[in-house]
Amino acid sequence: TSGNTGIALSLIGKAKGYKDINLLNSVLKISLRCLAVFIIFISVIMYITKSYFINMMTDLAIVANYANDYSIYLILHPICACVGLLLYGMYTGIGNTASIRNMMFVAVIFFYICQKILMSYLGNDGIWLTYNLTYLLESIILILYLPSLKKYFN
């Protein structure tokens, strides 16, 4: 994800410098397509190989069982987080840090409330669910800010 974000960040900065909305749209479309392939690939690989990697890291059955129980959250993580991380880089490339600040403000409040509620009902599953839901919320918020990028190209 970092490589995709780094390339997108520099190309978005170039689009802003030239005030080229078409380049912005192209970078966004291509980056999201590449990201979709990455998300599917990494999630499938993690699902298929989770037992191998868990057993490679520990030979304690109780630790392996716990890791296996919570591995679904690691498989879901790229699905929840990658779009937000890509858009975070794009907003940084344009210099639109207000959107990032606003997203982080909402995400921190959401995380605090969500973990208090979900951990009391679901225990450790609650914190893992909170973690993924917070990343998903960050992605959604940054998607909602996409129309505001057009002001940089007038």
Q: PLM features: residue spans?
A:
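Short helix-capping/hinge motifs at transmembrane helix termini and TM-loop junctions
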Residues: 17, 49-51, 58-60, 93-96, ...
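Alpha-helical transmembrane segments and their helix-entry boundary regions
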Residues: 97-101, 127-128
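Transmembrane alpha-helix boundary/anchor motif
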Residues: 7, 44, 48-52, 85-86, ...
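Small-residue-rich hydrophobic transmembrane alpha-helices
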Residues: 1-48, 83-95, 99
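Short membrane-interface helical motifs at transmembrane helix boundaries
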Residues: 41-68
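Membrane-interface helix-loop junctions in multi-pass transport and translocation proteins
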Residues: 17, 65, 108-140, 144-147, ...
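Hydrophobic residues within alpha-helical transmembrane segments
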Residues: 33-37, 41, 73-76, 102-110, ...
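Alpha-helical transmembrane segments of multi-pass membrane proteins
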Residues: 1, 61-87, 102, 112-113
